[in-house]
Amino acid sequence: MTIEALADVVRLHPELALFAAIVFGHFIGKIEIRKVSLGTVVGTLIAGMILGLLFEPEIPDLLKWAFFDLFLFAVGYSAGPQFFASLKREALPQMALAVVVSCTGLAAAIAMVALFRFDPGLSAGLVSGSMTQSAALGSALSAIAAMDVDEATRALLTAHAPLADATTYIFGEVGLILFVTVVAPRLLKVDLRQVAREAEAELQARTDEDDAALWDQAPLSLRTYRLENAELDQRTVHEFERRYAAGRLTVTGIRRGDQLLRDVGADARLALGDIVLVASRRAGVVGAALEVGTEVDDQELLSEPMVRASIVLTRREMAGKTLGELARGAARGLFLDSLHRGESTLPRAMGTRVQRGDVFKLTGSRAAIATAARNLGFIEHDQGRTDLVYLAGGVVVGILFGLLQVRLTGVPLGLGTSGGVLVVGLVAGWLYSRYPVVGHIPEPALRLLSDVGLIVFIAAIGLAAGPHAVQAIHEGGIALFAKLVGAGVVVTLAGPIAGLLLGHYVLKLPPVALLPGIAGAQTTVATLNALKERGGSDVYAIGFTVPFAVSNVLITLWGPVIVACAVALSR
């Protein structure tokens, strides 16, 4: 098949080019140079521009903006609980860090636009690429689409934006990783691994010796033993479990003669000859085996159902407590598999403080899980069903809200449809974390909406920009790329440098909170992953979530702001 024939097929079926851009973009994004890759988003943008140049498919704007709205709503829904939690007094330093980093980045971008006379399209790509926030590219393009210019100018500006984004994105990610993981620790004169160890030790510090009822974090093991140790005769289950507190052992069932006791309470008494079902990590089981008695194969007891559940923390009185405080006296028979806040996995340390909206992945007996749900919030029972009415209604309200405008000195000001959908998504996610009656969107569905919504939008943008990219490159030449790269370096580093100075000298944030806070304020998950890898700990995730949620909103809103600034500076 010739190129001309293939082009005819693509014009008849433009969806071929759309999905081909995603496929090729994946492989382009996987190409590594010194362990640094572009990532799927930028790879798809580049692939889309190439395919758009070759075949010039026509992708309906309806498809592009519909997927982008789904992406924005999913981002807002996920970040909502953390965003509103950042408004609390104890989170104000982290929120201040995010505001300063993102605002400094915007100020640097405006300065670069004024210096190099970038048009609105190049300005939009400069912000989205340098600050690695693809949502800002979409919100800026939405503003460009609303500009009062002819179609040829609008098409050229729309092509300039992804070109600038792809040019500045590489240093936007790599430069921030180097700054946060190498430069900043040297300036602060700290060792990332030592900082992590000290933070973990502080989180694990226990203030109460009665730790028999602390969350177990190890793989679960079930064993049955015949009680043969006379010292344990007539002891309560609570006393028995305290004896093996270091091993975190829980009695979940007893066979006494022909009688089978399930959901055993802590005040139940043991007797010689009982067959005891214990659940524990391996160390606890081994310790019990040495003292309790002979291990037996009681299949009926071993079939005791242990269930897994995701419990969302919604109770106000539990928010702000540490895992140790929650567990003490309330976690018997529960095993904490993981703890999540938004997209971040938190360390399962006794000093980790929880917030409303956090998700506990627990394993335990049905009774223990039910008790935990009453104490913490609610169980996500139907995790496979999405409330489509809530989702679609949220997008509708967001678009209408974004259309509202006020006039300031004759200039119309508003969030725009993109900003409106994002803000409504934030409120929707926050409301669900407080009142989980309607509006459930499971985490896998949110991830799918976010990933597919963004990647389809980026592919469509690339395909539309491809035919005009050659004109932009021809007109600007090497000088344009040099200006973009230089401006991108300034915008990428301006915010983190300001954040480092503010966080260290004014806010007095410890490095374990400051460094991931800078990564979150620049909305770069790759930097957090690099920080956790170099530091050898998940403890850095704690300082990431609040700045990430705040800056996700702010930098997305910077899209139309930078477009407006570029228009004003061009006059």
UniProtKB/Swiss-Prot annotation:
Pfam families: Asp-Al_Ex. The keyword Plastid does not apply. The chain crosses the membrane at residues 10-29, 36-55, 65-87, 96-118, 166-188, 388-406, 411-433, 446-465, 480-502, 509-531, 546-568. InterPro entries: AAE_transporter, RCK_C, RCK_C_sf, YidE_YbjL. GO terms for biological process: potassium ion transport. It is found in: Cell membrane. One of its GO terms (cellular component) is plasma membrane. The keyword Cytoplasm does not apply. Keywords: Cell membrane, Membrane, Transmembrane, Transmembrane helix, Transport. It is a multi-pass membrane protein. Residues 294-378 form the RCK C-terminal domain. One of its GO terms (molecular function) is monoatomic cation transmembrane transporter activity. Belongs to the AAE transporter (TC 2.A.81) family. NCBIfam families: YidE_YbjL_dupl. This is Uncharacterized transporter BPP2141.
